[in-house]
Amino acid sequence: YEELYEAAAKIKANHPEMDPLAFPMAMGGNFLSSFMAMNSGYGAGTPDSWTDGNLFPKMHQAPTVAAAKMMKKLMEYMPADALDYDFDKANTAFAQGNAAFTVNWNAYMPYVLDPDSSAVSDKVAFCATPGGPEGRYSALGGWVQGISSQSENKDAAFQLIQYISGKDRGVDFAMNGGSVARFSTANDSAVVEKYPFYPLLMDILKGYTGFGVYRPWPEIEKTMETYFHKVMLGEDPESTLLQGAQQVYVQAQRGGYNPGATGPKPN
């Protein structure tokens, strides 16, 4: 990330009309999506960089504070309204040639390679997520398909999921702009030729980090992003993130978790 900061300064000097960076930074999971790989890269842990093994929040600890300071530093080279940028807005800014570098989920990448939607479709290169002092990690996320307990056709619904997500459909789905998480698809020559970012998805095997996977996560995510935004707007990182961690702890208890039952509260 330090190298990215240095590169952004050079881009701004040579292209003052362009925003060197456009990250998804808004609420609603956008900020944490951009931040999670940085958080792990600065030593906050993996695959869950948000809590310890007993589900005590650790967003106030030194690694996350350092990562938040780095993100605040990078904001010098983001749009003035960077905290309003969601996945689509960041992707559009990049596709229109208004930003030099973006971080986003792979599902958004076909858009920037399509000449009908992107002004830079023939000028795009892809790289792994930037690393931090403690290594380089990839953000892991996705969607879940399920079958309603009220369904009258559960077997047919399951067969549909099997068909849609099956290996035989992977290449066709990817070639039509879909997001496929299959080794066979990521290594398919036709897919790689059209969408050269696919091999980079295999970096997930080198180290990954993700969202929380516990019941009150949606509420906790909103709280975390609220306090990270406060830091991005200039509030003191240490005290602000401590306040956020205290609120997250209460929310975890309301959600049915009692971290103190399985381990001591960290400093």
Language-model region placement:
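Long, aromatic- and glycine/proline-rich binding clefts that accommodate carbohydrate-like moieties
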Residues: 121-128, 174-230, 254-267
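Glycine-centered hinge/linker elements that transmit conformational signals in sensory
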Residues: 6-10, 52-83, 125, 129
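Extracytoplasmic/periplasmic solute-binding protein
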Residues: 2-56, 99
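Periplasmic-binding protein-like
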Residues: 16, 161-184
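Short helix-initiation/N-cap motifs at beta->coil->alpha
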Residues: 1-5, 82-96
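A bilobed periplasmic-binding-protein/Venus flytrap-type ligand-binding module shared by bacterial periplasmic
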Residues: 140-153
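Paired acidic/hydrophobic, glycine-rich loop segments that form the ligand-binding mouth/hinge
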Residues: 100-105
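Short, solvent-exposed loop/beta-turn-alpha elements that line the ligand-binding surface or hinge
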Residues: 25, 42-66, 114-119, 127-138, ...
